[in-house]
Amino acid sequence: MLDIKFVRENAEIVKENIKKKFQDKKLPLVDEVIALDEERRAAIARADELRANRNKISKEIGALMAQGKKEEGMALKEQVTAQAKELEELAKKEGELGEKVTQIMMSIPNIIDDSVPIGKDDSENVEVQKYGEPVVPDYEIPYHTDIMETFDGIDMEAAGRVAGNGFYYLMGDIARLHSAVISYARDFMIDRGFTYVVPPFMIRSNVVTGVMSFEEMDAMMYKIEGEDLYLIGTSEHSMIGKFIDTITPEEQLPLTLTSYSPCFRKEKGAHGIEERGVYRIHQFEKQEMVVVCKPEDSRYWFDQLWKNTVDLFRTLDIPVRTLECCSGDLADLKVKSVDVEAWSPRQKKYFEVGSCSNLTDAQARRLKIRIKGENGNYLAHTLNNTVVAPPRMLIAFLENNLNEDGSVNIPEALRMYMGGKDKIVPKK
């Protein structure tokens, strides 16, 4: 969320940014919020004027009463009473206007970084990095659920009876591989100096609106009926929420955290055959990384975060590439973002396995996450990135490590988490 003062003083910049994001329908919001803010500030100024006048009159009343001029003092008291009523009305007006301003400000997108390519949607994202040589073997690569079924490793039919579409049971070697990937990702990030955290898996509405837009919330979040609680769609939400209304001394920064959690999302539906199976589901697990830092350090940490993910995939010999998200593909709070994609030998193309985002002070402003510096307090910058998100990681892993006989190679990095196995063999 932008600062209303910035919007007042840079209305044309804000409008141009909206155009860059191809959200022209939001252009009228800029003038509307400026007008509402002017009205709100006028109400504040009038209230301040009345309070100053009330203090002055109160002193005069005391002096008149001391002089025995009771009648004149009572007349002034009537003025104070009348002003108190007006102050009450002004306070109500200020609150209502402030709420309207906040609601609109939450809909106005953050100013994108100058380096972000201009484009309407993800089809115009730009490749900025590639690792590994994509290989298409001369034997057929089955669909990922078909591979899992040869190991008796998945049961979506039973999950459908229990919970409906978008859920699964993982079993045996496939379940163990799932846990191995998560455990390896955790240790990988700990070895890079990140603090491991297991956060709450539910958050309150004030945290939800602090970390994401209303549109994202409506599309993603499951609400707990009768409670002010939502199931998290990613541990980033509860991790950033950890710092709500806090002030952290500069010398304690940066805060570099890696977190594990299950994630719950409403998104599921007609996304095409390539998103059947476990590609897009209601429940999955993820290892995340979050950084809270000084503003001048967020560009550095942005590059470090996405490179961590690429490095992890490199240790597993999975070809990956990194795409810079174009302006139209950025969520409103994001200033800059990249998607990390893994190679799919079966589809003969890359697919998304994670994303990294710099939100600068957008979340910090909403949640009042501040830094204590020599010259006072100021807003922190927040960043987040996916370390690894099974089961999408499993899709990439199985396809890239599948042998012609149906067995799957286990790279050295994962063997300690798989009981020393260098290969898993299908049962069917």
Feature names for model-found ranges:
Residues 1-134, 149, 153:
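N-terminal alpha-helical targeting/anchoring segments
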Residues 27, 130-428:
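TRNA-recognition modules of translation machinery and tRNA-sensing kinases, especially anticodon-binding
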